[in-house]
Amino acid sequence: MATVVRLTRMGRNKRPFYRIVVTDSRKRRDSGWIESIGYYNPMVEPEVVKVDADRLAYWKSVGAKLSDRVARITK
């Protein structure tokens, strides 16, 4: 199974926030995920990013790839 760390959209119309989740790369954006490791809220100033660094490091160590957006916001 190819795993990827990516964002899944939550919230309501025109007020999105995102969960940072680990999922199978073949699944759709908002379908089931393996584990939720944080969240990202771009609608507040400043943007809020909270990530469980230990779990992110674990998933990277077992071969999970980061999506472009997750790689950018977790720097």
UniProtKB/Swiss-Prot annotation:
GO molecular function: structural constituent of ribosome
HAMAP family according to UniProt: Ribosomal_bS16 (MF_00385)
Swiss-Prot/TrEMBL GO biological process terms: translation
Keyword Ribonucleoprotein: yes
Keyword annotations of the record: Ribonucleoprotein, Ribosomal protein
Gene behind the chain: rpsP
PROSITE patterns xrefs: RIBOSOMAL_S16
Family annotation (InterPro entries): Ribosomal_bS16, Ribosomal_bS16_CS, Ribosomal_bS16_dom_sf
Protein name: Small ribosomal subunit protein bS16
Coiled-coil segments on the chain, per record: none
Presence of keyword Ribonucleoprotein: yes
Highest taxon of source: Bacteria
Family label: Belongs to the bacterial ribosomal protein bS16 family.
Cellular component GO terms, alphabetical: cytoplasm; small ribosomal subunit
